[in-house]
């Protein structure tokens, strides 16, 4: 009898453990969702460096319905236009928006600028005593379209007003090396400052800071993407080892997409 009880207990435990394993299967939160992609040439479906872009791999792996608005050469000041186009074409029928922008702002020497405009003003305040007018400093987002932070502020103000219930996700610029298209489009690698004396790092850092300013998640592709075109060994991930280490090829896009696939597991796509 004792042996029978032990055997019965074993089968009950085994069945319970197997059931728990089955119920613990994770469904990717972005599976089957509708996702808009904003960006520049690396996102642009017409760019020839790669037939399949990072968003194409995510479509294959997660059955995502992709709305792609990236246009070659665009900078952060184009995001409001892409926002308006998405709103016009799909309204609120979208689950999330991913913004991958900034490398062209660096190349065009857009000044970094500031996040806030600050002023001294009057406001009502009472704590332990009757409320009264007091003098305080107040800050508001800088909306200067001639600066990088100002452009990000303008873009995210537009996005969060247009799509207040949607997930908005930012991707930092990735590392970049030489891009030699022609005599009038000859871009040096990130080891050099741009026209306004800034390294690419400053533009990456500003996108990361935007997470705190605007309450949006940021995935740091510069750090986690794994692509480092300044090394010849990493030229395999880019369009052309001699003339284009700016645009990832299909292998490069696949690596970026794999990184994004797993990082998106930590974020809800819809609310």
Indicate residue ranges for each PLM-predicted region.
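Alpha-helical cap/lid subdomain in secreted, periplasmic
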Residues: 61, 83-271
């Amino acid at each position: 009898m004792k042996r029978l009880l032990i055997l019965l207990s074993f089968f009950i435990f085994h069945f319970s453990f197997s059931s728990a394993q089955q119920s613990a299967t994770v469904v990717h939160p972005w599976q089957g969702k509708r996702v808009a992609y904003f960006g520049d040439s690396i996102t642009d479906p017409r760019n020839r460096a790669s037939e399949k872009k990072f968003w194409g791999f995510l479509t294959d792996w997660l059955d995502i319905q992709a709305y792609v608005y990236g246009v070659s050469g665009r900078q952060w000041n184009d995001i409001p236009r892409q926002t308006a186009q998405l709103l016009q074409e799909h309204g609120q029928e979208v689950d999330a928006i991913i913004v991958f922008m900034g490398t062209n702002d660096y190349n065009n020497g857009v000044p970094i600028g500031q996040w806030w405009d600050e002023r001294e003003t009057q406001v009502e305040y009472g704590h332990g005593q009757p409320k009264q007018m007091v003098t305080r400093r107040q800050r508001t987002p800088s909306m200067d379209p001639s600066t990088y932070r100002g452009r990000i502020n303008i873009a995210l103000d537009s996005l969060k007003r247009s799509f207040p219930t949607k997930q908005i996700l930012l991707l930092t610029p990735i590392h970049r090396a030489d891009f030699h298209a022609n005599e009038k489009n000859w871009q040096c690698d990130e080891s050099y400052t741009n026209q306004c004396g800034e390294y690419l790092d400053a533009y990456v850092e500003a996108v990361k800071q935007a997470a705190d300013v605007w309450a949006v998640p940021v995935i740091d592709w510069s750090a986690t993407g794994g692509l480092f075109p300044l090394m010849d060994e990493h030229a395999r991930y880019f369009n052309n080892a001699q003339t284009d280490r700016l645009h990832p090829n299909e292998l490069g896009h696949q690596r970026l997409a794999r990184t994004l696939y797993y990082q998106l597991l930590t974020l809800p796509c819809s609310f």
